[in-house]
Amino acid sequence: MNRLLKLTAIIEAAAGLALMVVPAVVVRLLPGSRLDTSAAVTLGRVAGAALCALGLACWLARDDGQSRAARGLVAAMLLYNVATVAVLAFAGIGFGLHGMALWPAVILHAAMAVWCIACLRRSPQNEMNWFDHKTRGPPSTGFDAH
């Protein structure tokens, strides 16, 4: 899971920075169209900031391994990757858009979604089981009153 989080952090932060700095170039590469209004440029930059935030979250979780927080982040990234595949594929098939990077981006996000699923299917390692089956309750903290 660590490698997935590191690679996701790099990819999404780079895409986010590109959208914030040169949104027209990114839009030209993906759907192959132009950003004609200031509102579209603004929304592109907001999307870039969101991708940077995802990248930062993945980078900060990269050494958490199988923690619940890291697994939750990977589940969120799975949703993001599946939605991105659907939106970009529909842009290509349904709207006939054809930017140079459109289909490579679809393939990349599909592969990342498969990797997310593989990581989530693995049983968590070194994760404390929250429910103690011996006492049928939460694990003891050592500070419980006797």
Placement of each model-derived feature along the sequence:
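Cytosolic juxtamembrane helix and N-cap/initiation of the first transmembrane helix
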Residues: M1-E12
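Core segments of alpha-helical transmembrane spans in multipass integral membrane proteins
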Residues: A13-M20, A39-R62, A75-A86, I107
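Interfacial loop at the N-terminal end of multi-pass membrane proteins
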Residues: P23-G44, D63-Q66, F131-H133
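Non-cytosolic membrane-interface motifs at loop->transmembrane helix junctions
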Residues: S33-V41, R71-L73, G96-I107
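Juxtamembrane helix-break-helix junctions at the cytosolic face
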Residues: C58-R71, G92-G94
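Membrane-helix boundary connector in multi-pass membrane proteins
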Residues: A86-P104, C119-R121
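Membrane-water interface at the C-terminal end of transmembrane alpha helices
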Residues: A111-W130
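Short, highly charged, low-complexity non-transmembrane loops/tails of multi-pass membrane proteins
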Residues: N126-H146
